[in-house]
Every structure is written in structure tokens, then in C-alpha cells.
Amino acid sequence: VTQLSKSTLCTRLAAGVDLVDEWAARTGLDAQLTRELAEYIFVKPVDWVAEVEGLAAAGAKWIIDLGPSDTVTRLTAPVIRGLGMGIVPAATRAGQRSLFTVGAAPTIAPAWSSYAPAPIALPDGSVKASTKFTRLTGRSPILLAGMTPTTVDAKIVAAAANAGHWAELAGGGQVTEEIFDARIAELTQLLEPGRAVQFNSLFLDPYLWKLQVGGKRLVQKARQSGAPIDGVVVTAGIPDLEEAVELIEELYTVGITSVVFKPGTVDQIKSVIKIAAEVPDRDVIVHVEGGRAGGHHSWEDLDDLLLSTYGELRKYPNVTICVGGGIGTPERAAEYLSGDWAKDYGFPVMPVDGILVGTAAMATKEATTSPAVKQLLVETSGTDIWVGAGKAING
């Protein structure tokens, strides 16, 4: 299209606006409103994303697409994801059914901002952060992640659990029935009355998986015998759909109601979503694991994983989202809990429900990490450089 033809086109469209003015005058329509609408249709550029976000900010909950097709609906649906708004394509049969069917009540997905932490005052006068994870488990939104060898030991796990945190006993070091039994006995002695821990089991290790959860079922048997275990974390791989559903039901049967899957890729997250869809009456906790820091079964960037799957995860009310991978400061943890991290990418806030702390916990008092390594962890600065799969920087 030449510059001349563009100019001619604009002139003709502007003339069309004038024609609308004439029609409005003849038919008694609001001339100002009619002209404004015509200008937006013919000659004025429209930032549709900004317009929709402005509607959301003004408190609008529904958009009615008057047609003639559902084009505007298809353009708008991605924009309103996470904003707590709905759109109805009134020119389609489905849209008309939702509008005119007696008793029909179209629903709106909750705004993602509704998942942000809220302050809650406890009976002792203290104020804590309330998230979907804290309401589900009764624990802090800061979790001690399972990692071999640090949380193979009972003391650090018990210390975290006694302080009100989710605390994972790493199955990577519980390599025989005798060692497992001894560790559970030690934990039972160290834990305060009413406290419990969670067991982290490596799905990728056939021997350990069969010993602990899948075959000999040491974890389930221990729970049935009164062991203080109320959660199982499936890490380093995701079972197939049928096996996962059977596992969830079995764990619920023995009193383990916190079932966690720890995906490290988009495909694995989608697998967990399918699992959650199959068990709508069971809570499924997802530990989305990025590849930063150490000890993770992921080579992916955490933000990329969340941006690709957050909307799908939030479609399921039985899914609770925790994240980890290089979150080493309170400030960074707060960005994920509040969801503000997503603003850097031009998205609405995407709050998560809990934060996994792993590598940073290696420097704690209770960790059996050597003093020299603890000091090195404290002194070593992080890097903003992303190291992809199969690559290395500085050795």
C-alpha cells in the first residue's frame, strides 16, 4: 500500500465518520457518542490491551461482545486472564445460552491478585501471612525443601518443623529399611507434640522409590504405625496418570493428605495438571522447580515455567502452587508471594502460595554442612547469567 493510497483511505474513512453524524441526526441517536464510536472504529488507533485493563481497573466484571462474530471475544480472552473478568460472545449460540437461559449463572475465574498473601492476626497477637498453602497446611509459606544430603539428617528437619515450617526429610539418604526406621525414630523424639514432617522420595531412583513408596511402602507403613509423616513429595520425575492417581488415593487412605509433585519442565507441569484434574476432591500441591542454585532436577528458568503454565494451574481449585530455585533472599521471596515478579514481563500479578528454600538452608545452624562451606555459601554472590542445559560458566 503506497503512502498516497493510505492517505486516500484515511480521507474516505474520515468521510465515513461524517456520514455517521448525518445518520445519527436523522435517527435521533446521541451524536457525540455515535461520532466517538465511529472514530474509534474507522480512524483512531486503539490500544485494546490498555482499554481492557482500564475496564478492569474501573471495576468492570463482564464484557459483552455484540458481534457480528466472536472475533472480539477471541482477541480479548487472553487479555482478561487473571483480571477477574468474563466475556460473553452474544452473537454466538453459546453466548446467547449463557445470557438467556433461565437460571443460568455464568461464572468468572478469580482474579490472580486474589491469591496474594493477606495478613492474619493469630490468638497470640502475632501477625502472619495467609496464603492458600498456609490455609491448607497450617504452616508457614516458607518451606524447607528436601535435598540430599542436607535434609537427610533429622535435626534440621525437626528444627524447621518445630518452628512451624513444612520440612522435607530427603529420601535420598534413607537407603535401607534400617536407616529409614532409625531416622523416623530420631525425628519422633525431636519433634514437638503435634508436629509432623514430609517425606521426599526420588521417583527417578527405582530402588529407593520401590523401597520407600512404590513397592515395600516403608512410608505408608510408618504412617500407619503412627510415624509423624503427613506429606509425601514425589520429586525427580512424575508418575504416569494412572499410577499417580492410585498413589494419591493410597496415601489419603493411610492418613497422608499432603501429596506433592515437583515438576521441573513445562511438560511435567502439564502432567501434574492432568493428575489434579482426575482427583478434583483431593488437594494436589505443585512444587514448581527452576534450575537456579543447586540440587534441582530442572534446567529451566523458573519464570519461564510459571509464565507458560500459571493460568492453567490456577484453573483448578485443588491445586496449590509453591516455587523454588535460587530464591535466596526475603525480598525475592516476597516478589513471588505477592506476584509482582510477573509485572516485569507485562503480565498481571501471579502470586504463588509458598516458597521453597533449599541451598540457602545449607548455611543454617542446624545443617551439618562444614563451617568452611557455610562461610563460602554466605560469601558467594549470585549471578544474573542464565546457564542453560548442557552448558557451564566459569568451569
Range-by-range predicted roles:
Residues 105-317:
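Active-site entrance/lid segments in N-terminal catalytic domains of soluble metabolic enzymes
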Residues 1-109:
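Acyltransferase/transacylase module recognition
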Residues 30, 98-104, 111-113, 138, ...:
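Extended charged low-complexity segments that act as oligomerization/scaffolding linkers
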Residues 313, 317, 337-395:
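Conserved active-site-proximal phosphate/metal-binding subdomains
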